[in-house]
A protein has these predicted regions:
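Structural marker of alpha-solenoid helical repeat scaffolds
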Residues: 31, 65, 99-100, 133, ...
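Short, charge-rich amphipathic alpha-helical segments embedded
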Residues: 27-49
Length: 221
């Protein structure tokens, strides 16, 4: 029976036994040098250890070995995103999607790349798709709501932010954005103030929430 070095390495990685993981992934690569998965796993390990240059080389090697390795494109995209190389990261997230990567994360990260470049309309379909795939993911639903607010699509943003608050009452960002939504798109200043107050009560250093709350109060007087 063949030893599955990748499984051994992943288990060690999950248990934060990084040296054991590195040894196992090395053995996986030596056993199957023409398979991308060992290189991807080693790249992921190196990225977690903040050895970015070597991680990049392993992801690139995985792509050379198998140009359809979706997880290699995704791992390399994450490195570039963290390095604020958003245009390059976006291309790689697209490739990971083209090659069939599963789940919502690649759609979400591709949307974030476009957001970083202030290309909000380009971000929208990818963030929407992420929310459709992972409807219970609070981070994605909040990001989708904020993006809709940025595009002044308040009618669609409101239920997204309300969902986040229903699921995570202590989410100051959701309260803040819902408060701003009420302030700029409705005449319901009471709800605007309520959610803004919740935001800076939950997070006392949330100066922007307090500033807008005070501004509304002054306007009402």
């Amino acid at each position: 029976m063949d030893t599955n070095y990748n499984e051994i390495g992943i288990k060690a990685f999950q248990e934060k036994r990084y040296e054991d993981a590195a040894q196992a992934f090395t053995q996986a690569i030596e056993a199957n040098p023409e398979e991308a998965v060992g290189y991807v796993n080693f790249g992921t390990l190196l990225a977690a250890m903040n050895d970015i240059e070597r991680a990049e080389r392993f992801f690139q090697k995985a792509i050379i070995v198998d140009e359809t390795a979706a997880t290699a494109y995704y791992g390399l995209a994450n490195l570039y995103y963290e390095a604020e190389r958003y245009t390059e990261a976006a291309k790689l997230y697209r490739k990971s999607l083209d090659h069939g990567i599963q789940g919502a994360d690649a759609y979400y990260m591709l949307a974030k790349c476009f957001e970083r470049g202030e290309q909000y309309k380009l971000a929208l379909p990818y963030m929407q798709r992420a929310a459709e795939i992972a409807p219970k993911d609070i981070q994605i639903r909040l990001a989708y709501g904020i993006l809709l607010c940025t595009l002044e699509m308040f009618e669609f943003a409101k239920p997204e932010l309300e969902y986040v608050i229903e699921e995570d009452w202590n989410n100051a960002d959701a309260h803040y954005n819902l408060g701003v939504l009420y302030a700029v798109s409705t005449t319901d200043t009471d709800k605007a103030k309520y959610h803004l107050k919740q935001a800076y009560t939950l997070q006392p250093e949330f100066d922007q929430a307090k500033y807008i709350y005070d501004m509304i109060c002054q306007r009402d007087n």
